[in-house]
From Swiss-Prot:
The keyword Transferase applies. Its main location: cytoplasm. This is Galactose-1-phosphate uridylyltransferase. GO terms for cellular component: cytoplasm. PROSITE patterns: GAL_P_UDP_TRANSF_II (PS01163). Signal peptide: none annotated. InterPro entries: GalP_uridyl_Trfase_II, GalP_uridyl_Trfase_II_CS, GalP_Utransf_C, GalP_Utransf_N. GO terms for biological process: galactose metabolic process. The gene is galT. Keywords: Carbohydrate metabolism, Cytoplasm, Galactose metabolism, Nucleotidyltransferase, Transferase.
Length: 509
């Protein structure tokens, strides 16, 4: 039976990657047989190739389950089922926590390397999907920005969407980040997590948990979430916790989305941070104007050369950093400057907050404070300091932590739309073709603004147009999107307004 062969291959994969030992083989085989309603077993002797990740085997097992009417043939049904399968190979939480602790006593990087690799091998991180994402770097005046087009989310068919609508509403787990997700079986509206494990942490004397993001937008993309389901809040404790984290994980950065709609992330209902082993473009950006805080002689400070408004603080002294960061946050919460359209409140609704990012530089602690404002008006209903409408063809979604640091996460539609445009650009009447096509018409104004810079279109292949023109311009557009989100603009008026705020919090130049 072919299904026995597939189970055998999956068991060999698990053995090769130390997910199980020989002593576990019979137990796991019987578990999988029960899951697949198999009443008999046929021994298979074959020299099969073991893949790096298990998805190819899992897809075939899911095909069998569909044929046998064990599951429906929907993307979510398959995800739920293959997660249940991999859950059979995933060690109990206590074992993973114990291994992580033992390794961290030798070296914290050994521990994170183990946990990240484990999260990929159990297919909690669906590596084969993530590898579909497009990625490139774009040179701008702010250095190389990083661009990714997100193609890893599979499309659901209409029947599945309809079934989801008819599902009864439940509140367990309360959200995608809650601790209750560990081992959860999943539903059509909430992902299965039998292969999900988390590591307990103490941050500033409070219980938090460390996990990896299943979507991995950058290397070792981690999520650090509170044990309690409570709303996102940026305050003094945020700075204490983030500095505590990088003290424990000096090879990682950590940052928080802002705590207000529009300028915040997609999950404001559960207090959490994101981190990882990646140096973002913003971290590479230099100080363009040094700032002195006389009350904090141990802190080196400055305004960062970045499209958004960023104050960088650096010190060996964590307490001083927390004090000044908190002072800056409290002042910014109440700060208005009519001349540049910054208002702290509309009636009693607050608009000002901060996106903080922390990292270690040798023995130094460094924290970037990105000033944010979520006000809207009639001309900008999605946000004044938000991607402007002329850039919505490329990016109209919120500018969250990852984008703030210089990595654009762009919608999957762009892959298809840009390829079409590249093909049309080979024709004389490309403007008409682009405007007549509902998929590409929205890009015409954007295209006309730069296309005359490029005189050799006819000699380039479609791939060359994509790589050397369209990808370059997408990167430049992303830098302008970040400028849109900056509260103090990069012109003289904006720069002076930023200096005025720095003076307001006790800084001088």
């Amino acid at each position: 039976m072919e299904i026995c062969s597939l189970i055998n291959r999956l068991i060999k994969y698990a053995l090769k990657n130390s997910l199980i030992t020989e002593d576990d083989v019979m137990f796991v085989r019987n578990e999988l047989m029960a899951l697949l309603h198999l009443k008999d077993w046929q021994d298979v002797k074959e020299n099969c190739q073991i893949p790096e990740y298990p998805q190819e085997i899992l897809d075939k097992i899911c095909d069998y389950a569909v044929e046998q009417k064990i599951i429906e043939d929907g993307v979510t049904d398959r995800d739920i089922f293959d997660t249940e399968i991999m859950g059979k190979f995933t060690a109990f939480p206590r074992e993973i926590i114990e291994t992580f602790k033992e390794l961290s006593q030798q070296n914290i990087k050994l521990a994170t390397d183990f946990f990240y690799n484990f999260s990929k091998k159990t297919n909690y991180i669906r590596t084969e999907r993530i590898e579909k994402n497009l990625y490139w770097k774009s040179l701008t005046e702010y250095g190389d920005l990083e661009i990714t087009i997100n193609l890893s989310k599979p499309e659901k068919d209409p029947k599945e969407i309809e079934r989801q609508k008819n599902m009864p509403q439940v509140n367990y787990p309360k959200c995608l980040l809650c601790y209750e997700n560990v081992g959860f079986a999943g539903t059509l509206t909430h992902p299965a997590r039998q292969n999900h494990r988390v590591i307990p942490l103490t941050l500033d004397n409070e219980r938090w948990y460390f996990q990896y993001s299943p979507y991995v937008y950058y290397n070792e993309h981690a999520i650090i979430f509170c044990s309690e389901h409570r709303e996102m809040k940026i305050n003094r404790d945020t700075f204490s916790r983030t500095l505590d984290f990088i003290n424990q994980f000096p090879h990682y950065f950590i940052g928080s989305n802002a705590d207000l709609p529009i300028v915040g992330g997609s999950i404001l209902s559960h207090d959490h941070y994101q981190g990882g082993n990646h140096e973002f473009p913003m971290a590479k950006s230099e100080i363009e104007k040094e700032v002195i805080f006389d009350k904090y002689p141990n802190i080196k400070a400055g305004i960062v050369k970045w499209p958004m408004s960023v104050l960088r603080l650096k010190s060996l002294n964590r307490k001083d950093l927390v004090d000044l960061a908190d002072k800056t946050l409290k002042a910014w919460r109440e700060y208005s400057d009519e001349e540049v359209g910054v208002f702290a409140y509309t009636n009693s609704t607050p608009h000002n907050t901060i996106t903080p990012i922390a990292r270690k530089r040798g023995d130094y602690f460094e924290i970037d404070l990105v000033l944010r404002n979520n006000r809207t008006d009639e001309a900008n209903p999605l946000g004044i300091f938000h991607p402007h409408s002329e850039h919505h063809n490329i990016k109209k979604e919120n500018i969250g932590l990852i984008e703030v640091m210089g990595l654009a996460v762009l919608p999957g539609r762009l892959k298809f739309e840009m390829r079409k445009i590249a093909e049309y650009l080979k024709d004389e009447d490309f403007e008409k073709k682009i405007s007549d096509d509902k998929d590409t018409a929205k890009h015409l104004t954007w295209l006309k603004a730069f296309i005359n810079k490029y005189s050799n279109l006819k000699t380039l292949s479609v791939d060359e147009i994509l790589e050397n023109i369209l990808n370059v311009e997408i990167g430049l557009t992303f830098s302008r999107v970040l400028e849109d989100a900056g509260v103090f603009k990069r012109d003289e008026k904006g720069k002076n307004a930023f200096l005025k705020f720095i003076n307001h919090i006790g800084g001088r130049f």
